[in-house]
C-alpha cells in the first residue's frame, strides 16, 4: 500500500487491516488461479473512500437459496429447512464482519441476497419451500444474536417490489416479477468459456446439478440466469463489495469460505450438505447422501428439526443422562441436559469420558450440572481426570480480583495476553541446570459468579483451527516448525523469573498431532502500573523488526474468530480444556463480580 510520506495515515492503516481480513477469509480454489493481488488496488480504492467518509463497509453475498432438492431417494441435506450447517455459516459471516467492525467503528455488514427466485424454477423448488427456508434463516440469525447480517431478496434489491414479502402469496408474486426482469431486460448471451470464473462455475455445474435429460441445456439455462443475476447485483449495489460462494479467481468478487477450518475441506455450502460430528468429536460438512446411516444417527434440535449427523460412539453415551452434544463456534463442544431433563449432578459425571472428549474437542463446556459440597467434589473429580498439578498456592486457584496475591494479571480485571497455562511453570534440570517449562495438560474450571455486564470473556483458540490457516500470509507450517521463540516475565508469587526458549510447533503428548505453542507479546504499554508486568517474546535468531512482524501475525491468528471460541461465563459452568491444544485469554471488565475455580491436571 502506498504511504503518504514516511508513515501510513490512519486511513491507510485501517484500509490495509480490512484488506488483510478480507484476504484471510477468501477461498483459494485449486481449480482457478488466485488473482486477489490483482484486485487489491481496486479494493483499496473503494475501501479508502468508504473509510474516509466514515461509512460502514458493506458486502453483498448472493447465497442461501434453499436446501438442495432430493435426487430420487438420495438427498445431500437433512431436510428443506436451515440446520446446524446454516448456523455455522451465518456465524462465520457475522464473525467476518465483526472483525472489521472491531477496527472500523462505523461497522461492517454482509447483505445476504437469497438466490431462490433466480434458480428455483429451474431446479423445481416449490415457492413454499424457498419462502419457508428464507424466513427460518432470518429467525436463526436473530436467535444467535448476529448483528452484522442483513437479508434481502433480488426483487427488493432491484426496486421492482416495494418491500420484503411477508406471506407466501406476496413472495410468489415477487418471484414472478424478478424472473421476468432476469429473463427480460437483464438477459445476456453466455459462453461457458468466456472467462476463468464462468469456466469454474460451468465445471462445478457438471457434477453439482441434478440429473436432466439434456444436461447441457439445463446448465446453459443456469449460467444464463446467473449472468443476469450478477448484472442485477452489480447495478443495484454499486457501493458494496461483492462476495461469492462459487469458485473464482477473486477478481471483481471474492469467494468466501463459509466454515472455519478444518470443517469444510471439500468446499461444500450449507444448502448442499449437513454437519457431521465424527466419533472423535471433530466436525465436518458432508454430503448427507454419502453417509452410512448405520454408523450415523440424525440428531434433532429442540424443535424436533433434523439438525446434524453424529457418528455412533460411546463417547456420547453418558450412562443415565439424556444429553445434547452441541458443537460450539468455531471450536469446542457444549454438553447439556436435553430439554425436559436434568439438572444432573456433577458428582455422577464419568470423568474418563470427559477426558476422552476434552482431548478430542477443546474447550469442552458442561452446562446444567449441579455440585453440592463444592471444593471437596471439585478436587475429587479433578483427581478422577488425572494427577493434579500443584502450585505455591495449592491445587485450586480462586480466579477473582485479589490485590493481595501477586500473579501478574491473573487476579485482576485487566485484559490478559493469549497464552497457555504453565508456560512459566518450571523445573530445573539436575544435570544441565537448565530451566524447563512443564505446563499441565488440562485446565478444569468451575464458574462461581459471572455478574459483569460487559467484558470478562474467556477466549479459547484451538490449534486444530489455527494450523490450517498458516501459509503465505503468515508463515508456512514447515518453516514455523524449524523456529523457536524466547520469552520472559518477572517472577511473582506463582511463576516467572526464568528466560525460556521454546518451539512453536510441538507434538501433542497424547494424540501425537501437531499443536501450536506461543505467548502473545505483552509490552509495558498494555500493563496497569503496580498491577501487572510485561511479557517479552521474540523469535530466536531473528532481527527485532522481523520477529515483531511474525509475532503480530501469529497473534492475529489467535484472535481470528474462525480460531477462537468466545465464552461468556454463566454461574455454574464447567469447562475442561486441553491446555496443549489451545491458548486462552481474558478480555477486560469493569463492573460486576467474576469468579471461577481452576485446577490443573496432567
Swiss-Prot record:
Listed Pfam families: DIT1_PvcA, TauD
GO function terms (MF aspect): oxidoreductase activity
InterPro entries: Isocyanide_synthase_DIT1, TauD-like_sf, TauD/TfdA-like
Listed SUPFAM superfamilies: Clavaminate synthase-like
UniProt keyword GTP-binding present: no
EC number: 1.-.-.-
Domain of life, source organism: Eukaryota
Entry keywords, A to Z: Oxidoreductase
PANTHER family (UniProt xref): SPORE WALL MATURATION PROTEIN DIT1
Assigned protein family: Belongs to the isocyanide synthase family.
UniProt function note: Isocyanide synthase involved in the biosynthesis of isocyanides (or isonitriles), a class of microbial secondary metabolites. The presence of an isonitrile moiety within a compound imparts unique biological (cytotoxic, antibacterial, and antiprotozoal) and chemical (transition metal coordination) properties and enables synthetic and biochemical applications.
Protein name (Swiss-Prot/TrEMBL): Isocyanide synthase A
Amino acid at each position: 500500500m502506498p504511504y503518504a510520506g514516511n508513515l501510513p495515515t490512519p486511513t491507510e492503516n485501517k484500509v490495509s487491516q480490512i484488506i488483510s481480513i478480507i484476504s484471510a477469509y477468501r477461498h483459494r480454489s485449486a481449480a482457478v488461479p488466485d488473482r486477489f493481488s490483482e484486485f487489491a488496488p481496486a479494493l483499496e480504492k473503494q475501501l479508502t473512500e468508504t473509510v474516509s467518509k466514515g461509512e460502514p463497509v458493506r458486502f453483498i453475498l448472493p447465497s442461501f437459496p434453499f436446501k438442495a432438492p432430493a435426487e430420487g431417494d438420495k438427498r445431500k441435506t437433512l431436510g428443506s429447512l436451515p440446520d446446524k450447517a446454516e448456523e455455522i455459516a451465518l456465524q462465520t459471516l457475522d464473525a467476518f464482519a465483526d472483525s472489521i467492525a472491531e477496527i472500523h467503528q462505523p461497522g461492517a455488514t454482509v447483505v445476504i441476497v437469497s438466490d431462490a427466485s433466480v434458480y428455483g424454477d429451474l431446479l423445481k423448488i416449490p415457492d413454499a419451500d424457498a419462502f419457508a427456508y428464507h424466513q427460518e434463516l432470518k429467525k436463526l440469525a436473530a436467535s444467535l444474536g448476529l448483528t452484522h447480517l442483513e437479508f434481502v431478496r433480488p426483487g427488493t434489491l432491484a426496486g421492482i417490489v416495494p418491500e420484503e414479502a411477508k406471506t407466501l402469496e406476496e413472495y410468489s408474486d415477487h418471484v414472478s416479477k424478478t424472473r421476468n426482469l432476469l429473463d427480460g431486460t437483464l438477459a445476456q448471451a453466455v459462453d461457458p468459456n468466456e472467462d476463468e470464473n464462468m469456466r469454474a462455475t460451468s465445471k462445478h455445474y457438471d457434477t453439482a446439478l441434478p440429473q436432466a435429460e439434456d444436461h447441457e441445456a439445463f446448465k446453459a439455462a443456469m449460467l444464463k440466469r446467473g449472468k443476469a443475476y450478477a448484472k442485477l447485483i452489480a447495478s443495484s449495489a454499486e457501493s458494496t463489495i461483492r462476495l461469492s460462494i462459487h469458485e473464482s479467481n477473486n477478481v471483481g468478487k471474492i469467494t468466501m469460505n463459509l466454515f472455519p477450518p478444518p470443517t469444510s475441506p471439500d468446499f461444500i455450502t450449507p444448502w448442499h450438505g449437513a454437519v457431521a460430528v465424527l466419533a472423535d468429536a471433530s466436525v465436518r460438512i458432508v454430503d448427507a447422501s454419502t453417509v452410512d446411516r448405520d454408523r450415523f444417527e440424525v440428531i434433532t434440535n429442540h424443535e424436533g428439526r433434523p439438525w446434524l449427523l453424529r457418528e455412533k460412539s460411546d463417547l456420547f453415551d453418558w450412562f443415565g443422562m439424556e444429553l445434547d452434544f452441541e458443537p460450539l463456534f468455531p471450536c469446542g463442544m457444549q454438553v447439556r441436559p436435553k430439554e425436559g431433563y436434568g439438572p444432573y449432578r456433577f458428582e455422577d459425571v464419568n470423568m474418563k469420558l470427559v477426558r476422552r472428549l476434552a482431548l478430542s474437542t477443546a474447550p469442552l463446556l458442561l452446562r446444567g450440572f449441579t455440585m453440592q459440597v463444592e471444593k471437596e467434589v471439585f478436587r475429587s473429580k479433578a483427581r478422577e481426570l488425572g494427577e493434579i498439578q500443584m502450585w505455591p498456592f495449592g491445587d485450586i486457584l480462586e480466579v477473582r480480583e485479589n490485590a493481595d496475591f501477586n500473579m501478574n494479571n491473573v487476579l485482576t480485571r485487566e485484559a490478559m495476553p493469549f497464552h497457555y497455562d504453565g508456560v512459566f511453570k518450571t523445573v530445573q534440570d539436575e544435570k544441565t541446570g537448565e530451566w524447563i517449562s512443564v505446563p499441565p495438560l488440562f485446565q478444569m474450571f468451575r464458574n462461581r459468579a459471572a455478574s459483569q455486564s460487559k467484558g470478562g470473556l474467556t477466549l479459547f483458540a484451538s490449534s486444530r483451527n489455527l494450523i490450517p490457516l498458516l501459509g503465505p500470509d503468515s508463515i508456512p507450517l514447515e518453516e514455523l516448525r524449524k523456529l523457536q521463540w524466547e520469552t520472559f516475565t518477572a517472577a511473582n508469587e506463582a511463576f516467572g523469573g526464568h528466560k525460556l526458549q521454546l518451539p512453536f510447533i510441538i507434538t501433542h503428548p497424547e494424540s501425537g498431532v501437531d499443536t501450536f505453542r506461543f505467548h502473545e507479546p505483552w509490552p509495558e504499554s498494555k500493563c496497569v502500573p503496580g498491577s501487572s508486568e510485561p511479557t517479552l517474546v521474540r523469535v530466536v535468531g531473528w532481527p527485532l523488526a522481523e520477529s515483531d512482524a511474525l509475532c503480530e501475525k501469529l497473534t492475529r491468528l489467535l484472535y481470528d474468530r474462525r480460531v477462537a471460541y468466545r465464552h461468556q461465563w454463566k454461574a455454574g459452568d464447567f469447562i475442561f480444556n486441553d491446555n496443549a491444544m489451545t491458548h486462552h485469554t481474558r478480555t477486560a471488565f469493569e463492573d460486576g463480580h467474576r469468579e471461577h475455580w481452576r485446577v490443573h491436571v496432567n
